[in-house]
Amino acid sequence: EDAQNIIRELDEALMLEGPRLDEAQIDALKSYHMSPFRTPRLAGKVYPSGPDALEKALDNYCEQFPVQRAISRGVVDRVVGLLSPHIDFRRGHRVYAETWQSIEEAFPQFEQVFLLGTDHSGSAGRVTLTQQNYATPWGVLPNDPDLVNTLIEGLGKKFALGEELHHVNEHSLELAAVWLHYFLRRAKGRTSYKNMPTVIPILCGSMTPYIYGQKKPSQDDNFATLLTTLDDAMKKRRTLIVVAGDLAHVGPAFGDPRTWDETARTALRNADYAS
C-alpha cells in the first residue's frame, strides 16, 4: 500500500512517464503556442520588468564599462558573429556590456539574427527550434516562420520540435535576447537602419559526444542539414549569429569546494589553450 501511495504521488507530481505526464506536456505546449510570444521568465528577477527601468539598467552597465576594443570601421561589414554570456546580469554585466558594445557599429546592417543558446536540459546532439516569437520588456522579436518551417522539414519534426517545451524556461536565449534587443533599439537612430531583423531562436543540447570524439559534427546528418540551411539563408540576408554560451562555472558559488584563486585560473586557462 505504501508503494502504491508513493507511485500515485509521483504520478500526480508529473515525475513518472505515463498518460498523466503526456497530457500535461500537450497542455503546456498548447499554452505556449497560443501565447502571442514566449513569456520572458526572468523579467523582474534577473533584470527589470519595465522597459524604462531595463533601459536605464543597461545604459548604466554600458556607461560603467565602455568598450575597450571596438571594431574598426573597415571591419563593420564583415561582422558575422558574437559570443555572449548567459549568466545573470548581476555577475556578468561587465562582460555583457563590453562584448555587445564592441560590435555596436554593425547593428544597423543586420536583417536576420540566428540566436543559438545552451539547452541546459537538452539531449545530446540535439538542436531545438520553435515557431514562437521571443520577447523582452521592449516588445516582440519577430521569428521567421518560413525559415523555421524549412529547417523543420529538413530535420524532421520529432528531432526539431521534440523538446520545444525547453524554450519555456531556458534562460540562455532570453538573457542574450535582452541585450540583442537593447542594441537593435539603439541602432534605430542610425541612417543605415532599415527594419527590426527577424530573430530565429535555436537551443543546442549537449555536445558531449563530439567533445569526447565519439563522432564528428561533420558526420551528423542533422547538423549538416542545419548548417546548410542556415548558410543558404545567410546568402540572402545580412546575418548576425549570436551564441549565448558561458564558459566554465567555477568556485564556491557553483559547488566547488575551494575558492577559485589566480593559480587555479591560470591552470584552467592553460588547459583551455592546450585543448
In which residue ranges do the predicted regions lie?
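Long, charge-rich, low-complexity alpha-helical segments
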Residues: E1-L42
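Active-site histidine-anchored catalytic micro-motif
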Residues: P36-S275
